[in-house]
Amino acid sequence: MSAADYPYFAPPPIGLAHRGGAGHPANLGIENTLAAFATAVSLGYRYLETDVHATRDGQLVAFHDEHLDRVTDREGAIADLPWREVAAARIGGREPVPRLDELLEAFPGARINIDIKAPAAVEPLWETIRAHAAYDRVCVGSFSDRRLHAFRRLAGPRVATAAGQLGTAALRYLPHVVSALAHSPGQVLQIPTTHVVRGRTLTLVTRDLVDTVHRFGMQVHVWTVDEPTQMQRLLDLGVDGIVSDRIDLLRDVLAARGRWPS
């Protein structure tokens, strides 16, 4: 199935608020909080990006790191803590760690790109999507092909998913096997602008890459892009989505092109 078969994907280009727009002045220090996501929505964002972990007792939280330490006033691995302890933590010293179901309920008009960060989050994620009938509101990806395959086994084709790491490598570095991706279960290639290989910085996103992905009926979403000149270049190449921490700057770039709200 192609991206066109999934209501999740709006006509491009679309802007995605990375962790709610972690680099926006109002969101500094409070990434992945309901307050940060509210800022993005207030700017007109319909697409939010977040990550999920599961607590020791199976609660699914919208949180990037494996540990609480970097962004909260508590310490410890989320997987080792019960929800009541994670719930007591404050991001930036003031905002609670949200559960994914709270995010879905707080912003019913938003579509959410979800990165599975841990194996224990796979089943709770599917259960949360089912409980909220959010099949058309989410796209699921992961840096782990194993986690992504496990999610697809549960969800089948009901939920849009990203091409895994194998798909990313094949599309850019293995042109002789690109044709095999015509049957990829993913609907979107999520990719950074560059990648370092053996000390060399390689440009990943080119017009040839974008055109190739489009031929397979997939979209191209690029992360994490915070410079307006880079945003302009990528849009000129025909990418379908840009994931950004600087949601204010991305909004301005899209608005100048007459593509806001996206």
What do these predicted regions represent?
Residues 1-262:
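Phosphate-group recognition and catalysis centered on beta-loop-alpha active-site segments
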